[in-house]
């Protein structure tokens, strides 16, 4: 059991007889005094795969489910299935393309260290990515000298097809660090 304000992305809860996996959380702080903070959570139903959206107050009690996490690496693609291999015992975990469509935008061709598969009683639930990823810009408008003084942004496309807003001074070929959950530019990568 946990309060709604303690729930994080990637956790699983049991709610209204459904097993739900937290995909995204929006925090809404009301301006009125005495009003409680609302947590708008987007889930995916583990059994049906459908998307579910619910709102909770910060002190609402939710029934959390403990999941097992296994470190994995991307192995290969077999048609519409993506195979990830367990780092320790080499167990293959198979995902259909539509199950992990959003996550695929953040997995470069060389792979992404720190990925985990979430399982419950042997059933594969989701692929969890690390907080950040380093990627190379493949397409953007040319960099403008002296643009570091302004805070304007421009769209940049990565090799995976992901498009995010980056500062004007960056150009194609630059490596950048991206915050995965917020889909935003953080800094240049080392």
From Swiss-Prot:
One GO CC term on file: cytoplasm
SMART domains, sorted: EFP, Elong-fact-P_C
GO MF term (any one): translation elongation factor activity
InterPro entries recorded: Elong-fact-P_C, NA-bd_OB-fold, Rib_uL2_dom2, Transl_elong_fac_P/YeiP, Transl_elong_KOW-like, Transl_elong_p-like_YeiP, Transl_elong_P/YeiP_cen, Transl_elong_P/YeiP_CS
CDD domains, A to Z: S1_EF-P_repeat_2 (cd05794)
Record GO biological process: peptide biosynthetic process
PANTHER family linked to this entry: ELONGATION FACTOR P, TRANSLATION ELONGATION FACTOR KOW-LIKE DOMAIN-CONTAINING PROTEIN
Family, similarity comment: Belongs to the elongation factor P family.
Record's protein name: Elongation factor P-like protein
Species this chain originates from: Serratia proteamaculans (strain 568)
UniProt lineage: Bacteria, Pseudomonadati, Pseudomonadota, Gammaproteobacteria, Enterobacterales
């Amino acid at each position: 059991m946990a309060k709604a304000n303690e729930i994080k992305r990637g956790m699983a809860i049991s709610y209204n007889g459904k097993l739900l996996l937290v995909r995204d959380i929006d925090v809404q702080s009301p301006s009125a005094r005495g009003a409680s903070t609302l947590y708008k959570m987007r889930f995916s139903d583990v059994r049906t795969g459908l998307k579910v959206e619910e709102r909770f107050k910060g002190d609402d009690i939710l029934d959390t489910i403990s999941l097992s996490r296994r470190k994995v690496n991307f192995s290969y693609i077999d048609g519409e299935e993506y195979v990830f291999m367990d780092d320790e015992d080499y167990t293959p975990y198979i995902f259909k393309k539509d199950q992990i469509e959003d996550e695929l935008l953040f997995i470069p061709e060389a792979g992404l260290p720190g990925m985990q598969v979430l399982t419950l009683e042997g059933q594969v639930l989701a692929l969890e990515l690390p907080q950040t990823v380093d990627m190379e810009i493949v397409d953007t408008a040319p960099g403008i000298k002296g643009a570091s003084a302004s805070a304007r942004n421009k769209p940049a496309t990565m090799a995976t097809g992901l498009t995010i807003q980056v500062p004007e001074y960056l150009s194609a070929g630059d490596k950048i660090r991206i915050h995965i959950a917020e889909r935003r530019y953080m800094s240049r990568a080392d």
